[in-house]
């Protein structure tokens, strides 16, 4: 059996510092990290399940790991991940994903946050961890992630994560939490373009854009018209219509110079009909993109929504992230990174037509397929 792919993982984790004192190092750190990644790919969600996977696959694991004292106990896995420096693991993770990500003009990088709901520790006053991720739509890869104590700290985490990534010629999309002048400026200074949803509590900006589109979606204003596109999706007893209007008419906004490179305003309307009821929602965006038609802009907006469907949903449903109880030290944050790495590898494999759950089962049952999944990281 080809073991080059598993051995490559040893090199991936080479830069991670071991937090243990020498006398407690019965097991190699790289062994612990690689076993955990393989186990998570194969369906393990808890430290007990990681240990069970290790003993079930111990002969195969010995073909590329040292395992001087066999498989570590579930307590050992938990202790090591609780003490492991999250920044070290993130640095290795980011170097790997950025090497794989397509560096092409127009690629979309979506920033969004997700709370690991059961990572809180009420007894010790520890809030649930909120992970901010950067998602590349073209590769369906998580490019990087940072942890914050709560959702409100996304405003601080986004610039920090952005500074670590290459967004040259990329379109960076962020929801309303990230609609900040400093963030827009940083994206442009790093060579990217921005498409930011406007917050409702940004009264002057939000209300002025709303007033403009309330009229512009009905009739031209002084000869100015908006580019328009409409998509209709029907199925499962519902009909969803998405309409988008874009305009590069920005002269009316007196503070436009405060937003670096501002060139266009966007209005997206979602109309949903289900069970005899209709709901309509409008969202507004600002962007430094120009010369694009409404259809292209809607593609970018919908591309941002994909982070919810293709990343957050998979972590909740396939990896049960919101039900898991890793609370001690850095264990929740570090294991979250392992789950995202596993998801990246599983998504990159195109040889199996099953969904993520099916691929995890296939990897557990067939070592050849597990090696194939691991090879997607080489």
Stretches found by the model and what they are:
Residues 86, 98, 163, 214, ...:
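Generic secondary-structure signature for well-ordered alpha-helical cores
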């Amino acid at each position: 059996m080809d073991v080059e792919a598993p051995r490559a993982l040893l090199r991936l984790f080479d830069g991670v510092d071991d937090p243990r004192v020498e006398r407690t190092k019965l097991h190699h750190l790289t062994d612990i990290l690689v076993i955990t990644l393989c186990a998570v790919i194969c369906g393990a969600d808890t430290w007990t399940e990681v240990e069970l996977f290790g003993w079930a696959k111990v002969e195969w694991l010995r073909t590329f790991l040292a395992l001087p004292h066999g498989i570590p106990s579930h307590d050992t896995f938990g202790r090591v991940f609780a003490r492991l420096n999250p920044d070290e693991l993130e640095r290795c993770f980011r170097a790997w994903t950025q090497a794989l990500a397509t560096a092409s003009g127009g690629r979309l990088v979506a920033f969004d946050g997700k709370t690991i709901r059961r990572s809180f520790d009420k007894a010790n006053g520890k809030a649930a961890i909120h992970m901010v991720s950067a998602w590349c739509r073209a590769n369906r890869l998580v490019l990087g992630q940072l942890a914050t104590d709560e959702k409100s700290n996304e405003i601080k985490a986004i610039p920090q994560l952005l500074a670590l990534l290459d967004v040259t010629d990329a379109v960076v999309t962020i929801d309303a939490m990230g609609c900040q002048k400093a963030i827009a400026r940083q994206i442009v200074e790093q060579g990217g373009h921005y498409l930011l949803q406007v917050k409702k509590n940004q009264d002057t900006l939000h209300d002025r854009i709303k007033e403009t589109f309330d009229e512009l979606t009905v009739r031209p204003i002084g000869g100015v018209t908006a580019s328009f596109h409409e998509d209709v999706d029907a199925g499962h007893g519902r009909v969803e219509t998405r309409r988008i209007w874009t305009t590069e008419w920005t002269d009316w906004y007196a503070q436009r110079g405060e937003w670096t490179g501002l060139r266009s305003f966007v209005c997206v309307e979602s109309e949903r009909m289900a069970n005899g009821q209709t709901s309509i929602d409008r969202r507004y965006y600002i962007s430094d993109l120009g010369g694009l038609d409404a259809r292209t802009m809607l593609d970018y907006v919908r591309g941002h929504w994909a982070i919810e469907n293709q990343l957050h949903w998979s972590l909740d449903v396939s990896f049960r992230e919101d039900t898991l109880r890793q609370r001690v030290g850095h264990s929740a944050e570090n294991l979250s990174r392992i789950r995202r790495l596993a998801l990246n590898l599983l998504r990159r494999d195109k040889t199996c037509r099953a969904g993520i759950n099916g691929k995890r089962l296939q990897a557990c049952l067939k070592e050849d397929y597990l090696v194939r999944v691991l090879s997607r990281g080489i």
